[in-house]
Amino acid sequence: MLVKQYFEESISDRPLRYQTKINMVRCLKKLELWNLPYSQITPSFCWNKIEGIINQNVKGVYAGYIRNIFNYDQSQIPVVMGIARIYDLPTAEELITIIERSKYRLQLLLCMYAGLRVGEACAVVPEQIKMEKGYYFLNVDRAISQDGKSFGSPKTLGKVMIPEFLALEVLGMKKEDYWQKGIPSKRVTAACYSLSDHGSKIHINPHMLRHWFATDMARRNVPIHVIMKQMRHKNVQTAMAVYAQVNNGDLIDALPIRPTIAKENLAKVVNLFN
């Protein structure tokens, strides 16, 4: 039996998201395990493959997939700690200027002002908007896969409060504005590459906009439990990591200041040549 046959037989019945299964297949192919005999697979063999990955964050994700696929525990395939990416985030005005030039402006605004992931933003329809006690909420209960072939559950379910202007834009959507099944959600990410502000060379992507949403709350001292709810994080540790996301300006502010001490003359210098 080959690994791909094992995967198709054992994983197909597990209650995993469509996108998760796609990512698992990508992982097995990237690690060159897909066409190998299943009998050749051992924790040590898999770990050696994972160790060959340079990107620490990808290494951590793939280690998790391998544990899941082959039912290994953490003593067999250790947990790999990722390295948080540090963004020097543009201002809201700079981001809006770029977003307004995109055909996917609504999806990008949902990432920026509702903290949605790109697949969740693409799947948004007016029925998800509800008003409660004078405020608008978006029920995040669906997402489209990267390849556009599946509408399913999002990575994390939840209800988030959104600004009125954004709620009204969603409520104003027509049927022809809805994301069509078969259109890959990764098109939004790909389109961002051509949106750089040629004056200041600002680049955006949906994940960076979601990160801006979280960081903006942290800088306004929004309580951690509120950030956790708005971001739909599964645990408080993930939400706390938002506070660890600092840019170079924050680091400069953290540097200690060396005091300036006036030097004292220890003795009077006498010119003997005059």
Question: Model-found features: residue ranges?
Answer:
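Catalytic-site neighborhood detector that most strongly recognizes the C-terminal catalytic loop/helix
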Residues: 13, 231-256
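Basic, Lys/Arg- and aromatic-enriched nucleic-acid-binding interface segment
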Residues: 78-118, 122
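N-terminal DNA-binding recognition helix of tyrosine site-specific recombinases/integrases
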Residues: 23, 27-81, 117-119
